[in-house]
Amino acid sequence: MMTLKEALSLASDDIKKLRDDLTLKIKESKIGAYVEQLTSTDISQSGVGIPIAIKDNINVKNWEITCSSNILKGYISPYNATVIEKLEKAGLSPFGRTNMDEFAMGSSTESSCYGKTLNPIDNEKVPGGSSGGSAAAVAGGIAIAALGTDTGGSIRQPAAYCGCVGMKPTYGRVSRYGITAYSSSLDQCGPITQNVEDAAILYDIISGYDPMDSTSANINYEAVTPKLNSDKKLTIAVIDNFVSQASPAIQKGFQKAVNALEEGGHKIIHKNMLDTQKIVSTYYIVATAEASANLARFDGVRFGNRKGESGLKDMYVQTKSQGFGHEVQKRIMLGSFVLSSGYYDAYYIKAQKVRHLIKDEYSKIFSEADLILSPVAPTTAPKFGSFKTSLEMYLSDIYTISVNLAGLPAISLPVDKDEDGMPIGLQFIANAYEEQTLFDGALSLEKAINYKK
């Protein structure tokens, strides 16, 4: 499959041929339900730029945007998200929609109203979530690259499960304008690509200050791609209590990466973080509280397909009960509970205090280290139906959610395979706004490992 870097050097006739070839691949693909979303888009109207697949919660003008939810089916976006404007300005163009967990709430892309997405490496395994369609599209060879969103690992975990590279920028580095909010203080948009250099290129294209987003960081920005340096020697921290909780396959892949980094001249130091159970509790209190507020607008009046005809209350009840899936309803209820009178101080305020402790923990580590190396998930991609309870699914994010709570940048890349041939992904975490160091370290590990798909 052609890389993004290679595609950027193509002439217009070659780009047209590439788009035709990818369109054919989409129509013939059996990877999963995200194909329905991709082919439902009128690709001929997408322009002539290099094709990039787009997650179904990012607004593209005149395209349907549903967030993979019944409540938004048929809604046509009247405008482009800032990241889409930046893509088009750089000569790239939206190529098609990719499937996702409903409103980005999930870790397996099973909660979509379009049905589940299959992992292209093993169709019995989940592709991860919530950006599972984007990762599957890249891994399956029907997209050069894709955009996803990451609220608690939703770019990095699918990339790890599918053997791709997935990058979450520093909070505020990429505009959220035009991206449907799940948790406003945690959401970030980022690239899913075939390799680290492509991720750096796409990151450079979509990042930068945007006055349309009040959370956008108004600071100087320098492109990372021209300065990529895989030879830079770094101090890399290993979080021992994270690694010890991972499966034997993940631990084996982790040690392989550590050995490669040490052989490359990088210094490895050992650290510990807060208990992962506390991190999970904090994340789901903060995320669901913000989700309950953000999704209140989908009421059948402002947004959402209206249901119920016997009065205002009936309309609200029927619209939301028929429009939202089970997982979304559950998270809205949990968020409403922790924000309610009598529980706000007991849960939400305490969660915000723990969030600051998490930031402090990272700050202490980065006073001694340039990067942190961590697993992305406790296991490789599980089979469909493996998560018997919501808690089991939530715990699959134990290594990624603290990064969002602290607003830090991170990148996932494949380093090995388990005995079933499934990818093992690890993540580098950097201090805020240190994306250059993040990409340098990731490129160094990628070259040292030389992962074969």
Curated annotation (Swiss-Prot):
Keyword field contains Protease: no
Substrates-to-products reaction catalysed: L-glutamyl-tRNA(Gln) + L-glutamine + ATP + H2O = L-glutaminyl-tRNA(Gln) + L-glutamate + ADP + phosphate + H(+)
Pfam families the record matches: Amidase (PF01425)
UniProt keyword terms in alphabetical order: ATP-binding, Ligase, Nucleotide-binding, Protein biosynthesis
Enzyme class: ligase
Record-annotated active site: K55, S130, S154
EC number of this enzyme: 6.3.5.7
Superkingdom classification of source: Bacteria
Gene Ontology molecular-function annotations: ATP binding; glutaminyl-tRNA synthase (glutamine-hydrolyzing) activity
SUBUNIT field: Heterotrimer of A, B and C subunits.
Function: Allows the formation of correctly charged Gln-tRNA(Gln) through the transamidation of misacylated Glu-tRNA(Gln) in organisms which lack glutaminyl-tRNA synthetase. The reaction takes place in the presence of glutamine and ATP through an activated gamma-phospho-Glu-tRNA(Gln).
Protein known as: Glutamyl-tRNA(Gln) amidotransferase subunit A
Gene designation per UniProt: gatA
